[in-house]
Amino acid sequence: MQSGGGGNGGYTNGRVRAIIGAKIFGKELIRLFFDTHAHYDDEWFDGDRDELIASLPAAGVELVVNCGCDKKSSEASIALAERYDFFYAAVGWHPHDARTWSCESADLIRAWAMREKVVAIGEIGLDYHYDKEWKDTQFEVLEAQLCLAEELDLPVIIHDREAHGDCMDHVRRHPNVRGEFHCYSGSAEMAKELLDRGWYLGFNGSITMQGARKAVETLKLMPSDRILLETDCPYLAPMPRIDGRRNDSRKLKRVAEFIAEILGTTPELVAQTAMENGRRFFGIA
């Protein structure tokens, strides 16, 4: 599963941009991070949203994709993307919100997809941790959105919690759909199939937590050109949570440091490679 460049998934011969600005990793680097999965529309940010977002570029954050979960949050994601130059939007129905899918939802996604800064359909998928009794509804809503992704030629962002087998069945039924499994928690074997299909895997603060053994082992085997960094903020702040439970894009630095230690490379190279991967995945020049 290695892709060029020898060990550590091809990191050894990688390239780091020389850019001066904010102090990141103890060096003069700026605009190094791409947070490929955030939820800045969440009410946890209501008290300081604008101030926090305005602070991100100086903290090294170059790009953010804000992900929708239903009609309201998808529209909020678009609004954030149209307000902030470095924000983009993904739109769709999360499995927790599958029951709010209606006959107009597909047409809404088609209309949203026409907006310049909508780059993906997401966050979509299956979740059996809380909502297994709504399994059939989740299936129908995921299937509808995968069909839309193929129709609209947009990548998908998959939420997969305790539903690995069924999520993979949906992926196999749509070989022309490209996508990413965010907050990857599957096996190395599942990762290999996804990578063989051209998919990407997203990693966030959950990889720093106890019980993340499968994600760590998967990372060790992955080609570097399929790794995406994300926060899922305001959730899943990396450990140790010395500055509180609320997550934000500035904490990608700690995720990059953790991954670099696993792979035997530098945090700068992890961040820069993930930046290039994210731009390629979402089609952002």
Where are these predicted regions, by residue range?
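Mid-domain alpha/beta scaffold segments of enzyme catalytic cores
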Residues: 4-6, 11, 15, 19-285
